[in-house]
Structure formats: C-alpha cells, structure tokens
Amino acid sequence: MASSDLEQLCSHVNEKIGNIKKTLSLRNCGQEPTLKTVLNKIGDEIIVINELLNKLELEIQYQEQTNNSLKELCESLEEDYKDIEHLKENVPSHLPQVTVTQSCVKGSDLDPEEPIKVEEPEPVKKPPKEQRSIKEMPFITCDEFNGVPSYMKSRLTYNQINDVIKEINKAVISKYKILHQPKKSMNSVTRNLYHRFIDEETKDTKGRYFIVEADIKEFTTLKADKKFHVLLNILRHCRRLSEVRGGGLTRYVIT
C-alpha cells in the first residue's frame, strides 16, 4: 500500500472518530438540566419565528395582489385618458337637436267622431314553477369585520373576506343545483359528482348545506392554501360556518 493511500485512510478514520466524539458530547449536553432549559427556549423561539414567517408570507401575497390591482387600475386610467383625449379632439361643431315628443295627447286634440281603439289585455302568463331555494352564506358586515381580532385577520381586508364568501356561495349553489337536478337529465360527469355528494353526507349534515375542499376546486378559482384556511377561521369566528369531520373529510356547513 502506498504511503499516500495510508495517510488518506488514517485521515478518514480520524475524521470518523472526531464525528463520533462530537455526537457523544452533544448527546451528553442534552441530558444536563441547564441545557435542557436552553433547548426548550430555543424550541419556543423557533415556533415564534415560524409564525412570523407565516404572517410574512401572507403579507407578501397581499402586497402582490395590491400591486397587480394597482397595475390594472393604472392601465384602465390610461385607456380612459386616451378616450377622453380622442373625444376632446373630435367634438363635432354642430350637435343634433333633441326632439321632444309628447307622450300624452290632450282631449281637445281628439276627433270626437273617431272611434276609440280599446287595447285587449295581454294574456296572463303562467307563473314559473317554484325553484327550490338554496341556502347561501350572508356577507360579513363592517361591525363584524371590526370585531375580528387583529392577529386573526392580519392584513386581510373586508372586501377580500366577502369575495371568498361569494366564491363559497358559488360552490354551494353549483353543488345543490346538481343534487336538485333530475337524474335522467344528467351526463356522466354530473352523475359522478352527484354520487360523490351523496357519499359525503352523514347523519350530522342531514338537511344542512355544506361543501368540501373538492367542491372549492371544482366550482371556484380559490386555492385551498394557508390564506384560505385563515379566511375559514375568520368565517368560523363570525359564525358563518361550522365543521363536521369524519371519514377523512372536513365538511364546511353553512350556518
């Protein structure tokens, strides 16, 4: 064996021995009461940092949405400005006069010998069949929004919460329209959805309107991410919905 190979082998063995010594010393450190207290404090600080990172992530998402909205507004204002400038430069020198027509004719203008035409009443239309009403989630009021703790709503706005309620109502209406639809008129896709809806019902949801995350993905553009679940916490706080769990599913019941 060459001397260089022997030196490399010795170096490798010494490195392994050093790693073992460090591991043993760290394990022994973890058993000391004073160091346990320090490790517990570090664990608590890591939890706090994780919460701050979650809030920071929500703040970044909010700022991105605000930035996109401002860009759209700026583009819209530029278009409006161009239209106004075009109108300003192309105003005609003479505008047509508006002619006023009298809707009622005075009695003195009528010819007494001319027979008066009596209009026949239109046939009464049959009222449409009553459609089964679907319960929707009421929007959040300003007072309710102000009553939500600041740590819960973070940077979320009043309009953002009500926009989510609008999307949830869209999912509820789409789901229960299928459930109220005659089975004969269903295609294969609708029939599969119908059977899924029936399978998801339990004795606790009987007679109540509810959706699951799959309905959110099926009927809306919402994403079931951290922000969505923060919004659900706010809706639970405002008593707009409750949860029924079972069979690996969380059912969001409209209250």
UniProtKB/Swiss-Prot annotation:
GO terms for biological process: attachment of mitotic spindle microtubules to kinetochore; cell division; chromosome segregation; establishment of meiotic spindle orientation; metaphase chromosome alignment; mitotic cell cycle; mitotic metaphase chromosome alignment; mitotic sister chromatid segregation. It comes from the Eukaryota. The modification Phosphothreonine is found at T157. Residues 49-91 form a coiled coil. Residues 132-255 are annotated as: Binds microtubules and protein phosphatase PP1 subunit PPP1CA. The modification Phosphoserine is found at S242. Keywords: Acetylation, Cell cycle, Cell division, Centromere, Chromosome, Coiled coil, Cytoplasm, Cytoskeleton, Kinetochore, Microtubule, Mitosis, Phosphoprotein. Residues 92-132 are annotated as: Flexiple loop that anchors MAPRE1. The keyword Phosphoprotein applies. Gene3D superfamilies: 6.10.250.1370, Ska1 microtubule binding domain-like. The keyword Acetylation applies. The modification N-acetylalanine is found at A2. Changing R155A: Decreases microtubule binding. Residues 106-131 are annotated as: Disordered. One of its GO terms (cellular component) is cilium. Disulfide bonds: none annotated. GO terms for molecular function: microtubule binding. Residues 114-131 have a biased composition (Basic and acidic residues). It is found in: Cytoplasm, Cytoskeleton, Spindle; Chromosome, Centromere, Kinetochore; Cytoplasm, Cytoskeleton, Microtubule organizing center, Centrosome. Its main location: cytoplasm. Phosphorylated by AURKB at Thr-157 and Ser-242 which negatively regulates the association of the SKA complex with kinetochores to allow correction of aberrant kinetochore-microtubule interactions and promote mitotic sister chromatid biorientation. A motif (SXLP motif) lies at residues 93-96. Belongs to the SKA1 family. Component of the SKA complex, a microtubule plus end-binding complex of the outer kinetochore that stabilizes spindle microtubule-kinetochore attachments, promotes alignment of chromosomes at the mitotic spindle equator (chromosome congression) and assists suppression of the spindle assembly checkpoint. Kinetochores, consisting of a centromere-associated inner segment and a microtubule-contacting outer segment, play a crucial role in chromosome segregation by mediating the physical connection between centromeric DNA and spindle microtubules. Component of the SKA complex, composed of SKA1, SKA2 and SKA3. The SKA complex is a homodimer organized around a central W-shaped coiled-coil structure, formed by the interacting domains of SKA1, SKA2, and SKA3, each end of the 'W' is extended further by the C-terminal microtubule-binding domains of SKA1 and SKA3; the complex forms extended structures on microtubules. Interacts (via SXLP motif) with MAPRE1 (via C-terminus); the interaction is direct and stabilizes the kinetochore-microtubule attachment of the SKA1 complex. This is SKA complex subunit 1. It comes from Homo sapiens (Human).
